[in-house]
Swiss-Prot record:
Protein name: Aconitate hydratase A
Reaction(s) catalysed by this chain's protein: citrate = D-threo-isocitrate; (2S,3R)-3-hydroxybutane-1,2,3-tricarboxylate = 2-methyl-cis-aconitate + H2O
Isoglutamyl lysine isopeptide (Lys-Gln) (interchain with Q-Cter in protein Pup) crosslink residues: 394
Cofactor note: Binds 1 [4Fe-4S] cluster per subunit.
Pathway(s) the chain acts in: Carbohydrate metabolism; tricarboxylic acid cycle; isocitrate from oxaloacetate: step 2/2; Organic acid metabolism; propanoate degradation
One BP annotation, GO: tricarboxylic acid cycle
Keyword annotations: Iron, Iron-sulfur, Isopeptide bond, Lyase, Metal-binding, RNA-binding, Tricarboxylic acid cycle, Ubl conjugation
Pfam families for the chain: Aconitase, Aconitase_C
Gene this chain is encoded by: acnA
């Protein structure tokens, strides 16, 4: 990190620079008490205040900015822009590969414009964990892990060689190889410092990450959040992150959770509360006496779900529990002493008696939390477990009946247009016939839509599938697999289930993908692996797997039965996202649940199940076995944690974390400061963003004669815009791979090909569940191509190429919460590469809006209360947008004037709100994007 980022060159207007002595070590620090007013700030804003004090340069960060945060008005709407300099950047491989591709391309662009390519180097430590590429091709047997890793290397060798080149070519860039763990778990267990030391200066650890669940580290008191890959690249290159001083929601925790309630239940309850309250763009900070009762692992689970709450961060302050966790996970005694001394010196140590001032207040009595699941399509759709069967029976109608009306939804909820119901099926209602000994998902189906399908399977025997069958049960995802209480709870439940003679249903694809190798160690030490394996939960891989759609194919006979009979089947996973189409293309309904409940639903085999009154099976004596009979007690879980987890597990697991296995070490790795691009590569291609870029930006211009590429509904996620999953044969992305000699079995996923813009542009707006309202009853990556007579249906990519040839700019129209979900920079990159100049919506989710600006696309909002529907816009119009050119004079217009001319010549006119929110964002937009801005600044500073 450059000296200006550590504080060595701070202007120090407040005389805050001082020395902190801990043991026999002395550190330079910037004391917050030098700035009056900071003592009353919430913890999260103290971290920001210190950041500004230390990086004050008189230009980007001034004395006024520091005073603005010290005098923070909790009741004001955010309006003051500050420049936050994160201490480090963390990445996963799907988003990290394109970052390193961009940096490699920037080196060449700098050289081409006469600069020094070695100027392009991370100034902040950057760490990348490879966790997104492992796919569960093999499951349910002892060879699953080894075989899945083998296949991962076969598919991804090119990408991994490229990352190894990057590790050698760039300073301060490290890669954690595949098969180690999930990025956020590796972050809390090893990478996070809580207090950083660099150049002799001690300061709070902060980070930005190229994954929206970066907020997991908030549980350790580390302020950090997900940003798009483009912002992460800029942060690596020393650019501060532009932000408004946020509102902070104080979330008071009191009471203790009841027996039988898990951390997952707490986080689903908090998600539900915060979504209802509305926390988009705000910090959430937990406080109160109840904080001490929340184990660090549970804090990390709560922090992890911040994107699902809608908040920028969801943070816990530092206290004794933080220190205990750092000790358990193998941090040094010197580090522990520094964290405690620094936090106490800066007023950052949690004092339960002191109530900071917050903008808004919420409270949860933990004793009121009940077991819950969430589904069938959004994390905030919480269902109490006692009501799960009823809720499923209501929801199933939306997936099996034609034109079933979707109930009216609240402002922030998805509507029919965005998330289509399935095609109609032939409905039948169950009759009680003669008993059948085959396992069946249609038992007790009276009163709900049912379509029993007999499946013959050589491996699994004969069984009956039906609507609601659980075909995926995944213990997966960073959210829960780092949490010993739920992971050991699940394993103890498995032990009791096996002892009672229960088994997982034959149609369930099981998955166990822990977030780090430590989980495997404590399962082994506790002697619980054999029970999990008996129920089918063999180690499948250390990575995201099911949670990001790397579920792998369902067994062929099951997939065929589902698709031939249009069954609405379900997945249950211990993840954080359950959007439609995300988990598996065969599965329509997805539910989030705690790891123990994942196992329970795998045994039940259907969502049409009431755990209170329906037995999971019978024991050897024929007695009914209910969930309550196998649920482990809190005392059992605590005893197992105490006897099976120790510090040595962490120190041994992470001793050689960057070294990798033989496969990693034997990868042939190119060398040199610039990368030798392979023109035949279908994984890694030189990025096109700097092609023909002049040293000075050209003026921005108004948009004239634009056409609509897509007219979309509410809650369109970044996964709809740039899916990460499988590449469908026959689509433009598949056609490109076919033309380049790639066999269908080697297509791999869109996420794994993010280093190749040719594949990614063809995959943009290509999610199988996306509904473009320019077309009736069509899902997937299609639009109308108005360059052709009559505007026929065409692939979005093919139409965009025709518009490009004709010199016609494009716009996208959307609804509420456009761009929610993952911090997926390709959702913005793909948009700009398709020729889209503006996106007009009712509202944007935070990260995607800033990513669009970062790629030179202007985000606009309909006037308050208006929408495409209310303005009677159907997407066939031609659009002129005037007022953008005002940006050339250094001013950002509040609105621009949009004229939509219909085919009959009539006009619809409105003033769209310009969502360029800060002066820094205006600079990026004027330069055509953030990377172009950084590159031009680099050239200026090297002259």
């Amino acid at each position: 990190m450059s000296s200006e980022n550590t504080g060595k060159s701070s202007l120090n207007s407040f005389g805050a620079r001082d020395t902190l002595t801990v043991g026999d070590q002395s550190y330079e620090i910037y004391r917050l008490n030098a700035v009056p007013g900071t003592e009353k700030l919430p913890y999260s804003l103290k971290v920001l205040a210190e950041n500004l004090l230390r990086t004050e340069d008189g230009a980007n960060i001034t004395k006024d900015h520091i005073e603005a945060i010290a005098n923070w008005d909790p009741n004001a709407e955010p309006s003051i822009e500050i420049q936050f300099t994160p201490a480090r950047v963390i990445m996963q491989d799907f988003t990290g590969v394109p970052c390193i591709v961009d940096l490699a391309t920037m080196r060449e662009a700098v050289a081409a414009l006469g600069g020094d390519p070695n100027k392009v180097n991370p100034l902040a430590p950057a760490e990348l964990v490879i966790d997104h590429s492992v796919i569960l091709d093999v499951f349910g047997n002892a060879s699953a892990f080894e075989r899945n890793v083998e296949l991962e290397y076969e598919r991804n060798a090119e990408r991994y060689q490229f990352l190894r080149w990057g590790q050698g070519a760039f300073d301060d860039f490290k890669v954690v190889p595949p098969g180690t763990g999930i990025v956020h778990q590796v972050n809390i267990e090893y990478l996070a410092r809580t207090v950083m030391v660099r150049d002799g200066v001690a300061y709070p650890d902060t980070c930005v990450g190229t994954d929206s669940h970066t907020t997991m580290v908030n549980g350790l008191g580390v302020l950090g959040w997900g940003v798009g890959g483009i912002e992460a690249e800029a942060a690596m290159l020393g650019q501060p992150v532009s932000m408004l001083i946020p509102r902070v929601v104080g979330f008071k925790l009191s009471g203790e959770i009841k027996p039988g309630v898990t951390a997952t239940d707490v986080v689903l309850t908090v998600t539900d509360m915060l979504r209802r309250h509305g926390v988009v763009g705000k910090f959430v900070e937990f406080y109160g006496k109840g904080v001490a009762e929340v184990p660090l692992a549970n804090r990390a689970t709560l922090g992890n779900m911040s994107p699902e709450f809608g908040s920028t961060a969801a943070i816990f302050p530092i206290d004794e529990e933080t220190i205990n966790y750092l000790r358990l996970t193998g941090r040094t005694d010197e580090q522990l002493a520094l964290v405690e001394a620094y936090a106490k010196a800066q007023g950052m140590w949690h004092d339960p008696e002191r109530e900071p001032v917050f903008s808004e207040y919420l409270e949860l009595d933990l004793s009121t939390v009940v077991p819950s699941i969430s589904g069938p399509k959004r994390p905030q759709d919480r269902i109490e477990l006692t009501d799960a069967k009823n809720a499923f029976r209501k929801d199933i109608h939306n997936y099996v009946e034609q034109n079933h009306p979707t109930p009216e939804t609240k402002l922030d909820e998805a509507v029919e247009e965005s998330f289509p119901a399935s095609d109609p099926v032939s409905l039948s209602f169950a009759d009680d016939g003669a008993p059948d000994m085959r396992p069946s998902a249609a038992n007790g189906a009276t009163g709900r839509p049912t379509n029993p399908v007999l499946v013959h399977s050589e491996e699994r025997g004969d069984f009956v599938l039906d609507h609601g069958a659980v075909v995926v049960a995944g213990i997966t995802s960073c959210t829960n697999t780092s949490n010993p209480s739920v992971m050991l709870g699940a394993a103890l439940l498995a032990k009791k289930a096996v002892e009672k003679g229960l088994t997982t249903k034959p149609w369930v694809k099981t998955n166990m993908a822990p977030g780090s190798q430590v989980v495997t160690d404590y399962y082994n030490k506790a002697g619980l692996w054999p029970y999990l394996e008996k129920l089918g939960y063999y180690l499948g891989g250390y990575g995201c797997t099911t949670c990001i759609g790397n579920t792998g194919p369902l067994p062929e006979e099951i997939s065929k039965a589902i698709n031939d009979n249009d069954l609405a089947v379900t997945a249950v996973l211990s993840g954080n996202r359950n959007f439609e189409g995300r988990i598996s293309p065969d599965v329509k309904m997805n539910y989030l649940a705690s790891p123990p409940l994942v196992i329970a639903y795998g045994i039940a085999g259907t969502m049409d199940f009431d755990f209170e009154s329906d037995p999971l099976g019978q024991d050897s004596e024929g007695n009914d076995v209910f969930l309550r009979d196998i649920w482990p007690s809190a005392a059992e879980i605590e005893e197992t944690i105490a006897s099976s987890i120790n510090r040595e597990m962490f120190t041994e697991s992470y001793a050689d974390v960057f070294k990798g296995d033989d496969r990693w070490r034997s990868l042939p790795t190119p060398e040199g400061d610039t990368f030798e691009w392979d023109p035949a590569s279908t994984y890694v291609r030189k990025a096109p963003y700097f092609d023909g870029m002049p040293a000075e930006p050209e003026p921005v211009s108004d948009i004239k004669g634009a056409r609509v590429l897509a007219l979309l509904g509410d809650s369109v996620t970044t996964d709809h815009i740039s899916p990460a999953g499988a590449i469908k044969p026959g689509t433009p992305a598949a056609q490109y791979l076919d033309a380049n000699g790639v066999e269908r079995k080697d297509y791999n996923s869109l996420g794994s090909r993010r280093g190749n813009h040719e594949v990614m542009i063809r995959g943009t707006f290509a999610n199988i569940r996306l509904r473009n309202q320019l077309l009736d009853d069509v899902s997937g990556g299609y639009t109308r191509d108005f360059t052709q007579p009559g505007g026929p249906q065409a692939f979005i990519y093919d139409a965009s190429e025709n518009y490009k040839k004709a010199g016609i700019p494009l716009v996208v129209l959307g609804g509420k919460e456009y761009g929610s979900g993952s911090s997926r920079d390709w959702a913005a990159k793909g948009t700009v590469l398709l020729g889209v100049k503006a996106v007009i919506t009712e509202s944007f989710e935070r990260i995607h809006r800033s990513n669009l600006i970062g790629m030179g696309v202007i985000p606009l909002q309909f006037p308050a209360g208006e929408s495409a529907a209310s303005l009677k816009l159907d997407g066939t119009e031609t659009y002129d947008i005037e007022g953008i050119e005002e940006l050339n004079s250094g001013k950002t217009p509040k609105t621009v004037h949009v004229t939509a001319t219909k085919e009959d010549g009539s006009k619809v006119e409105f003033d769209a709100v310009v969502r360029i929110d800060t002066p820094g964002e205006a600079d990026y937009y004027r330069n055509g994007g953030i990377l172009q801005y950084v590159l031009r600044n680099m050239l200026k500073s090297s002259k």
